[in-house]
């Protein structure tokens, strides 16, 4: 039986990332053969990873990496926020973003086949990470955006990396692109323009907005406040030329009824029409970047601000950790009991 020295254990830990006891046990089982010990740890690690495969991993980090005219934003998940702050996990996320930006895969299948700096595939790296870190670690998704030499990337991460954004701006500079990415991180647009919203989606969202108004009106009635009117429209897509013409005619009739001189109408009507547009594009404002009030200049929408500086947004991608993942609502006492039972059975 070979002597299992502290030096040998340390060497195995450095090569495999295993804990002290796991490394020592592997060396004992392989009679001190470090290469066989590494293989044994890998096999055990894959078995552990397989046991964790059905767990829900809804925490984690985004990663953002710019490689010349290509940028990648990715999402990597872990089971707990604690592990998401682990240095090994953070390094894995950053390395993955770099490999994705450089490899330019077409889909997740191609991404998982990319070779990491360690020489293993991305998929194998995540199996190893799951075994080493002790939680299910999963590569969830990525987006690649390409630009021309004349365009600029805005790369931004927020809330400790839980949100990652890439934007492309034409006609501006990198500082403008970065500011837009900060806006996107905060305001959560899902598409660029109202033209990308589905007609039925707009109708459903408008109905939901009016439902909220109904609830508000119930509260207002209790304190004798006047009821708020329902919204007739929710998107610029619904504001046809006839609708806009009628709105302007209604404003003129209102001004006439108030006795306002016609010679000053031209100064009043534009502001009231702007108000009409804001009041009747609430769905656009919630979901489309160009319709949102710009957080860097709240006197303008993003679209109006970009026009004022002769710039435009070409594309953007925003990832937030856990979007669309249904987290398991575990009972804490039951979880502790299950953990203790598992420990007793081992």
From Swiss-Prot:
This protein's GO CC annotations: cytoplasm
GO MF annotation, one: translation elongation factor activity
Name of a matching Pfam family: EF_TS
SUPFAM superfamilies documented for this protein: Elongation factor Ts (EF-Ts), dimerisation domain, UBA-like
GO biological process: translational elongation
Main location, first listed in the record: cytoplasm
Cross-referenced InterPro entries: EF-Ts_dimer_sf, Transl_elong_EFTs/EF1B, Transl_elong_EFTs/EF1B_dimer, Transl_elong_Ts_CS, UBA-like_sf
Domain of life of the native organism: Bacteria
Record's subcellular location: Cytoplasm
Keywords: Cytoplasm, Elongation factor, Protein biosynthesis
Region described as Involved in Mg(2+) ion dislocation from EF-Tu: spans on this chain: 80-83
CDD domains cross-referenced by the UniProt entry: UBA_EF-Ts
Assigned protein family: Belongs to the EF-Ts family.
Function: Associates with the EF-Tu.GDP complex and induces the exchange of GDP to GTP. It remains bound to the aminoacyl-tRNA.EF-Tu.GTP complex up to the GTP hydrolysis stage on the ribosome.
Stated name of the protein: Elongation factor Ts
Organism of provenance: Streptococcus pneumoniae (strain ATCC BAA-255 / R6)
